[in-house]
């Protein structure tokens, strides 16, 4: 372990100790205490990004995007609370007391700090690793063929899934996708195959020449996918598809210039307005949907950044709600949800009425039933750490950070080695779903998408 890594790890440990000392000395929740925790959060995310920058020399990489997303979803409202800017219609204070939020804040900071410490410990600079030219050329050919195969196989299921979603949204609105009216026959099988469509496009993107017609066609398809996502009322996958495209260009083609970043920032502001409008209008009619988006953006009272972060930050809800149920009403899981998630590799061949993973590892469904809610609240990595290990959940987050770094860090995955870069951006594409879900989704992403692609390419290279 080099001196820089030791200093970064020590700085994070010291920082979280200071946060906890403040929390312990001011155990009675007050508005000032909540704001102070928000300030600690600002400092912690800045320290995390700065430490990653000085350790790796890069900042706009898959791991950093995942880390920022984790903070925005798990701590976003606390960031805004420092400035009294939380959108009232999204505020967690409508469901929880100051004391509930205060406890959730310190727990979230501890877990996210542990996650990043795990990543720092896992980081290993492999920039000097050289891939043999003949192996790299074989990987290009194999990945290109694999991309064509995945796109051709997933195309029809992808189209079917999206047409069904469009019909449901047009008929029942956004909520129809998640209610009884949104049930799709064989939806799981179709969705599993359809989800290979974008990874297939990413295979083709990485093996196409920059500026070529094939690359431009792929970006046009990405744009159409994003429009379809927004029409259906979704946003997360559209945002991450944009982020993956920028990651590809910045880390695989050539670094983006300062002028380019300015242009992207201006475009990002406009995109935030659109995303905020989508969130506001997605429950309504689709008759004049895109015209309504334009009209909503002209509202001077709308601040897209505040609206967007307020909604993202409401994902602290599962943690705060779980803390009110466990351990008072139900006991801790002691790692069982992680173990049951791993059993999802075993198909249900009639041994069970419901697969054990579906019963014990889908914690969003558990929370919906335990809290007697009429809608699915989702879940989070931090909430799952709590329900399993309580105050010691940070240990699970440290281990998770270690392995997430191994997958997401493109230096540790040998820079521009095409296979490992491909796996990193596929994981990034799937990662926003993971932040707002339980561990079982991470297992499924690895099992159904990343491992098959990895082992297929490695097997073909060795032939």
Language-model-detected regions and their locations in the chain:
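N-terminal "leader" segments that precede or initiate the main folded domain
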Residues: 1-132, 241, 245-274, 437-458
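Membrane-interfacial loop-to-transmembrane alpha-helix junctions, especially the N-terminal start
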Residues: 2-12, 57-71, 146-147, 213-220, ...
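Hydrophobic alpha-helical transmembrane segments
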Residues: 19-27, 48-55, 102-117, 184-199, 203-210, 224-232, 306-316, ...
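Membrane-embedded catalytic interface detector for glycan/lipid assembly enzymes
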Residues: 32-35, 91-95, 123-256, 260, ...
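Central hydrophobic cores of alpha-helical transmembrane segments
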Residues: 63-72, 217-227, 262-269, 398, ...
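Small-residue-enriched transmembrane helix-hairpin modules in multi-pass membrane proteins
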Residues: 177-184, 272-401
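Hydrophobic alpha-helical segments
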Residues: 200, 374-463
């Amino acid at each position: 372990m080099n001196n820089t890594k030791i200093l970064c790890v020590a700085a994070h440990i010291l920082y979280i100790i200071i946060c906890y000392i403040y929390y312990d000395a001011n155990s009675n929740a007050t508005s000032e205490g909540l704001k102070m925790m928000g300030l600690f959060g600002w400092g912690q995310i800045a320290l995390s990004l700065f430490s990653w920058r000085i350790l790796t020399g890069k900042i706009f990489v898959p791991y950093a995007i995942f880390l920022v997303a984790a903070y925005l979803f798990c701590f976003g409202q606390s960031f805004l609370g420092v400035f009294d800017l939380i959108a009232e219609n999204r505020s967690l204070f409508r469901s929880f007391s100051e004391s509930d939020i205060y406890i959730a804040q310190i727990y979230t900071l501890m877990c996210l700090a542990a996650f990043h410490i795990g990543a720092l410990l896992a980081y290993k600079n492999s920039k000097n690793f050289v891939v043999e030219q003949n192996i790299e050329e074989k990987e290009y050919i194999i990945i290109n063929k694999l991309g064509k195969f995945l796109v051709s196989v997933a195309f029809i299921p992808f189209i079917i899934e999206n047409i069904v979603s469009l019909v449901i949204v047009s008929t029942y609105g956004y909520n129809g996708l998640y209610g009884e009216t949104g049930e799709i026959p064989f939806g799981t099988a179709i969705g599993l195959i359809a989800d290979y469509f974008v990874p297939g496009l990413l295979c083709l993107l990485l093996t196409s020449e920059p500026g070529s017609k094939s690359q431009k066609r792929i970006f046009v398809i990405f744009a159409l996918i994003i429009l379809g996502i927004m029409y259906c009322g979704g946003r997360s996958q559209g945002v991450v598809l944009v982020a993956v495209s920028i990651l590809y260009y910045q880390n695989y083609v050539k670094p983006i210039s300062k002028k380019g970043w300015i242009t992207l920032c201006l475009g990002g502001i406009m995109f935030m307005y659109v995303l905020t409008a989508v969130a506001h209008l997605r429950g309504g009619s689709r008759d004049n949907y895109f015209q309504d988006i334009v009209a909503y953006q002209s509202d001077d009272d709308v601040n897209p950044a505040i609206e967007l972060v307020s909604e993202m930050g409401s994902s602290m809800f599962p943690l705060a709600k779980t803390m009110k149920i466990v351990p008072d009403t139900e006991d801790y899981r002691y790692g069982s949800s992680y173990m049951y998630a791993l059993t999802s590799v075993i198909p249900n061949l009639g041994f069970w009425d419901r697969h054990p993973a579906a019963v014990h590892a889908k914690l969003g469904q558990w929370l919906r039933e335990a809290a007697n809610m009429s809608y699915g609240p989702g879940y989070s990595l931090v909430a799952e750490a709590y329900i399993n290990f309580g105050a010691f959940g940070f240990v699970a987050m440290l281990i998770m950070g270690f392995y997430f770094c191994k997958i997401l860090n493109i230096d540790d995955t040998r820079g521009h080695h095409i296979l490992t870069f491909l796996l990193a951006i596929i994981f990034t594409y799937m990662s926003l779903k993971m932040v707002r879900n339980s561990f079982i989704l991470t297992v499924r992403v690895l099992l159904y998408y990343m491992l098959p692609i990895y082992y297929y390419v490695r097997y073909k290279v060795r032939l």
